[in-house]
Amino acid sequence: MTFAETFTEKGQYYASKIQQNKYMQAISNGLMSLLPIMIIGAFSTLLSSMQIDVYQSMIAPFRDIIALPAQFTTNALAIYAAFSIAYKLAGLYGKEGLIPGFVSLFSFLVLTPISVFEDGELVINALTFDWLGARGLFAAMIVGVLTARLYVFFVDKNLVITMPEGVPPTIAKTFSGLVPAVLVAVLFTITAGLWKMTEFGSFHQFVYTILQIPLQSLGGSIWSICIALLIMQLLWVFGIHGAIVVLAVIRPIMTALDLENLAAYQAGEPMPNLVTGSFWSIYANFSAMLGLVVVLLFLSKSKQFKIIGKLGAPGALFGIHEPLIFGLPIVMNPILAIPYILSPVVCVVIGYILTITNILPIPIGMQVPFGAPIVLSGILQGSWKLGVAQLLMIPLCALIYYPFVRILDKKNAEQELAQETQEKAAEQSMDRVIS
C-alpha cells in the first residue's frame, strides 16, 4: 500500500470518527441552526453602527430601535445555543428534543449569576447580558451537552411516567419526560449553589477563565488558522471533505470570537479579535480558487481546462469549489496539490499583515450566509476595502497556480492535439475507403 493510500485510509477513518461523534455533531449543528438568529443580529448591528456621519445623523432618532434586535440575538446568543445544542443531541440519541432543550435553557439560566442593584430602598435583582452573549457561549455548549446527555440517560434507565393507553400522544410524551427533566433541573440547581461557594463565584466565570479565554487565544492566532487551513486543504487533496472535519472543531471558537467583535462594533469600541471566522471567510474562501479559474480560462491552452474553468467559475464566485476540486481533479494530484494548499494560506497571511499595519480594517464579525459572493461577503464585514482586497488577491493566486497548471496544461494540450490528429487521419482514411 502506497503512502497516499495509507494516508487516505487513515484520514478517512479519523475524519469519519469526528463526523460521527454525537457531541461534535450536536454542537456544530446546533450553532449552524442559529444562523438565522445571528444574521438578524448582524444586520441590526451593521445598520445601527455604520460609521458614516450623514447616515448616523439620519437614523439618530430611531437608532436604538434599529439596534434592538441585536440586543436579543447577538448579545443573547448563548441562550439560543443552550436550547439548540441540547435539542440536536437528544435527537441524535433518538429522543424528542423539545423537553431536553427547555431543561437545558433552564439549567443555563439557573447557572447564570443574578446581579443585585439598590435604588434607594428598592432592591433590584437583574439578569444582565454579561453571560448571555459571547462570554457565555462555551458554558452554553457544555450545559447543552450535559443536560441532553443526562436526560437521555434517565430516560434509558426507564425513569419515566408511563401513561395508560388512550392518552393523547402529546400528553403521554410530556409526562414521560417529566421525571428526567426534574432530576436534571435539581442537579443543575444544586450545581449552581455549589459554584457560588467557589472562588470563581459561578460556573460561567470558571468556564470563561479556564476554558474559553485560553481556547480563544489559541484559536484566534495567525498560526492556528494557518495550521487549520493546511490540514483542511491536505484532507481535500486526499478526497476527504476537509471543511466538515476542520470546521466541526474550530467553529465554536470562531463563533465566539466573531460575537465579541460584533458586540464591540455595536458598542463603538475597538474590536478585540483579529483572526476570527469572518477573517477566515474573507481571505481563505474565494480568491485562491478564483485565481485558479483565471488561469484555466485565460492562460491555459487545453480545451479540457477551459471547459472546467467555465464550469467552475460560477460556483467559485460563491465559495463553492467542488467542481474544480473533483473536475480537474485536484484530488490525488501532486502537482496541483502544492498551489491548492499554499494559496489560501498566502492570502490569509497577507490579509493578516495588512490588518495589523492598519491598511485593512478588522472584520466586524457579521455572520454572512454561505453562498454570499466575493466582494459582497467582504463589504458586509464593515468596509468596502475588504471586498477590494478579495479582488486584488485573485491575480496573486493566479500567479501561484500558473506554473503548476502550465505543466499539466502543456501535457493535456499535446494529448488533445495528438487525439485530433488521429481523428482527422481516421476520417481521411474512411473517406478514401468510401470513394
Each predicted region: which residue ranges?
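Hydrophobic alpha-helical transmembrane segments
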Residues: 69-81, 136-139, 218-238, 270-289, ...
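Inter-helical loop and helix-membrane interface segments of multi-pass membrane transporters/permeases
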Residues: 48-69, 106-135, 164-166, 198-216, ...
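Early transmembrane hairpin of solute transport permeases
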Residues: 16, 20-161, 331
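Generic multipass alpha-helical transmembrane bundles of integral membrane proteins
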Residues: 182-300
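Membrane-interface helix-loop-helix junctions at boundaries between adjacent transmembrane segments
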Residues: 115-185, 189-223
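Alpha-helical transmembrane segments in multi-pass membrane proteins
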Residues: 40, 78, 82, 86, ...
